[in-house]
Amino acid sequence: MITIKAEARQGQGKGASRRLRSAGKFPAIVYGGSEAPVSIELDHDSVKNQEVKEGFYGETLILSIDGKEVQVKVQAVQRHVYKPKLTHIDFVRV
């Protein structure tokens, strides 16, 4: 299984998301199950390297959010219009 390190997001909104992206990170969200949705931030380069692996979109992934492991699947991916960059990912708990 693929493991991705994540951190809980502090800021919300467009400005906070832009600051994340300029720092080489991007926002994401984990939802589903009986727990409340969690906004997280991911390192762009590490996720981009994992994305090219077979099974990233179809298999169960492990997100390590501040040390707590959560099993998720990729629900939706948003990309930059013309740059090869990820701008947001939705994960759903398994």
From Swiss-Prot:
UniProt keyword list: Ribonucleoprotein, Ribosomal protein, RNA-binding, rRNA-binding
UniProt record, GO biological process: translation
InterPro entries: Rbsml_bL25/Gln-tRNA_synth_N (IPR020056), Ribosomal_bL25/Gln-tRNA_synth (IPR011035), Ribosomal_bL25_short (IPR020055), Ribosomal_L25_dom (IPR029751), Ribosomal_uL5_bac-type (IPR020930)
CDD domains listed in its UniProt record: Ribosomal_L25_TL5_CTC
GO MF annotation: an example: 5S rRNA binding
Superkingdom in the source lineage: Bacteria
SUPFAM superfamilies, A to Z: Ribosomal protein L25-like
Its biological purpose: This is one of the proteins that binds to the 5S RNA in the ribosome where it forms part of the central protuberance.
Family of this protein: Belongs to the bacterial ribosomal protein bL25 family.
PANTHER family the record matches: RIBOSOMAL PROTEIN L25/GLN-TRNA SYNTHETASE, ANTI-CODON-BINDING DOMAIN-CONTAINING PROTEIN (PTHR33284), RIBOSOMAL PROTEIN L25_GLN-TRNA SYNTHETASE, ANTI-CODON-BINDING DOMAIN-CONTAINING PROTEIN (PTHR33284:SF1)
Name of the protein this chain belongs to: Large ribosomal subunit protein bL25
Organism: Pectobacterium atrosepticum (strain SCRI 1043 / ATCC BAA-672)
